[in-house]
């Protein structure tokens, strides 16, 4: 089902919800509408429905329960990275131990929000979209360099691969970090995984 939230001032945010509990789905939908965001919400409850919706609904953000009857958030994230690699993925779950949450974040999930305290959901979505806007502010060449830096290639190797000077690569790298507001390579790698530019190395 697709649900829209009333608000005529902005283009609606397309939210794909992977959830097999209808009561929980209603609570999440209510929280999104309560926040004042204008949304177009589509709900699916299976791997097949999720894959189809990624192609037909083309979501701006994905919200996923951690564990469904025959599907889970890790499998869903893998499918998402194949079909819409840069779309934000936020886990909204009833219960997740810290170790599982950490694994999900390292795998590329944007955040983990507990159903018992969904007041942070709006901020999680806003932060995810802000991260993507900064990515879209980079040039195609800068994204090439970002991928290679995040994948662990040294400056000299990147220059050789792209047919550019070392000085040019250093300039690109400096500008990338400035635009993304990132100050070290470790954080840059995490960002690249988070926005789907490189696969997670678990």
Residue locations for each model-derived region?
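The C-terminal output helix
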Residues: 126-137, 199
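Recognition helix of helix-turn-helix DNA-binding domains
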Residues: 154-187
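Acidic, metal-coordinating helix/loop segments flanking the phosphotransfer/catalytic sites
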Residues: 29, 43-61, 71
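Short amphipathic alpha-helix used as the core "switch/output" element in two-component signaling
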Residues: 33, 52, 67, 72-86
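Alpha4 helix (beta4-alpha4-beta5 surface) of REC/receiver domains from two-component response regulators
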Residues: 74-75, 82, 95-112
